[in-house]
């Protein structure tokens, strides 16, 4: 079920998407709610699964993981056992940072963050040796032009004016 967000929820989410380290005092000042009201709303948003997690975003380049690889996978097999095996391999591979099942010509898309081509090759060999795949192709990113973790939120009314 999708939670109905009011203007204050949207304002809090907007602020936290930009800075998850914002204090209750800062959130209170920017929303016009008390710090306690902000805290209660955040707890409800977490309990309802609207806020999934609060994380620190790292710069892959600065920690030696400067190669982004998109792996396009086609397969002939689609059974639950096959998918369970595939998921297990993906879940035990920390290089895989995103994983999607797609509609269209490609069945699955993986996004990897690796330090080197040889690290990608090691993962590729592990994958093809343990999962029956029809086709695997890799696309190496030359440059990241946009990356955002901020989701678009509905506009708020005047009650909780956005001040980011």
Curated annotation (Swiss-Prot):
Q: Which Gene3D superfamilies match?
A: 3.30.70.920, Winged helix-like DNA-binding domain superfamily/Winged helix DNA-binding domain
Q: Which domain of life is it from?
A: Bacteria
Is RNA-binding set as a keyword in this record?
no
A Gene Ontology annotation in the biological process aspect, one of them, is: response to amino acid
Q: Which InterPro entries match?
A: ArsR-like_HTH (IPR011991), AsnC-type_HTH_dom (IPR000485), Dimeric_a/b-barrel (IPR011008), Tscrpt_reg_AsnC-like (IPR019888), Tscrpt_reg_AsnC/Lrp_C (IPR019887), Tscrpt_reg_HTH_AsnC-type_CS (IPR019885), WH-like_DNA-bd_sf (IPR036388), WH_DNA-bd_sf (IPR036390)
Q: Which GO terms describe its molecular function?
A: sequence-specific DNA binding
PROSITE patterns xrefs? HTH_ASNC_1, HTH_ASNC_2
**Domain HTH asnC-type: start-end pairs:** 5-66
Q: Where is the signal peptide?
A: none
User: For this UniProt entry, which segments traverse the membrane?
Assistant: none
Gene Ontology, cellular component aspect: cytosol
User: Which keywords has UniProt assigned to this entry?
Assistant: DNA-binding, Repressor, Transcription, Transcription regulation
Annotated disulfide bonds: none
Q: Per its UniProt record, what Pfam families does this chain match?
A: AsnC_trans_reg, HTH_24
| DNA-binding stretch(es), residue numbering of this chain | 24-43
- In UniProt terms, what function does this protein have? Represses the secondary, H(+)-coupled glutamate uptake system (Gluemp) genes.
Name of this protein: Glutamate uptake regulatory protein
Species name: Zymomonas mobilis subsp. mobilis (strain ATCC 10988 / DSM 424 / LMG 404 / NCIMB 8938 / NRRL B-806 / ZM1)
Q: Which gene encodes it?
A: grp
